[in-house]
Structures are given as C-alpha cells and as structure tokens.
Amino acid sequence: MDKNNNNLNLNEVANSFIQFFNKKNYVDKEINSKIFNNTETDLWWITGDESIFPFSGWKPIQFRLNGMHFLNSGLDKYSMTETEKIIDNERRIILLVIKTLHMGYGMVNEYTAEIALVLSVNESGKIFSIKEYLDPSEIIRVANSTPALQELFKKVYGNFLN
C-alpha cells in the first residue's frame, strides 16, 4: 500500500514478488503471508496439458512453492529479472514478463527462460491467483538435462520423464 494516499501500489506488489523469488525462501509462511493471500487455497495455473505435463494446470500456490523450494534450493545460480510489466489498476492485475536463469545439479550451461505471469491482486495488496505462460516442453528438456534433475523432478511430480 502507498502510505501517502492508501492506494494499492501494484508496482510494489510486482517488485516484492520478484524479490521473494530471488531470495529462494519459498516455505516461510510468515514471508508468504506478506505477499500471497492464502497459499493453501489460492491457485497457480501453468500452461500445458496436465495428462502430459503433471506440473501444468491449477494447483495450490503452496504446492508450487514447495516444488520450487525442493528444486531451486540446490541450484548454484538462480535469478529472476523483470523484462516487462503492464499494470491494470482498475482490475488489480499485473502482467509480468520475467527472465529466469538457472545453473546447478551438474548442468553444463546456464539455462534461461522467459515466462509471462498474470498476477491477480486483492484489495489488501496480496496475490490470490497466478497464471504462468511458458513452453512446458522446455521444463521437460531441463528436467532431462542431468541425472540429478531427473531424480528431483521425479520426486516432485512423479515418473513422467522420457
């Protein structure tokens, strides 16, 4: 919230979202409650056919955060950077285009991805819905890139890798 006029500052919400992911502290409920409305019941959707890509579809935000904690905690490098942002103040929606960089688990090269996120924000300035647009086959490619990543993805999402 903007303390000067009590208006919701969606730019601050977007910046907090990016900072949250760069700190990689996905399971701290106190921190989560400052950014997200309710991680147990609010949902995060990822593009793709769930019958092919088990990480796709609507899942509780906390499920997504737990998976990120498990997968990203062992990365040697991880960063999320905003490349574009469009804010619709009237509908309290943020379109955030981000670039992520990953390196670890025996990866030979850094992996970068560009992802579009639609964040829906309530009147209290907390995110209650996320839609994530990316190429799900890229996740499969990265998951198959090293034996360590294959095992981690199997632990989080089951045995779906080729």
UniProtKB/Swiss-Prot annotation:
Superkingdom, natural source: Eukaryota
Family: Belongs to the UPF0523 family.
Protein name, per record: UPF0523 protein A
Source organism of the structure: Dictyostelium discoideum (Social amoeba)
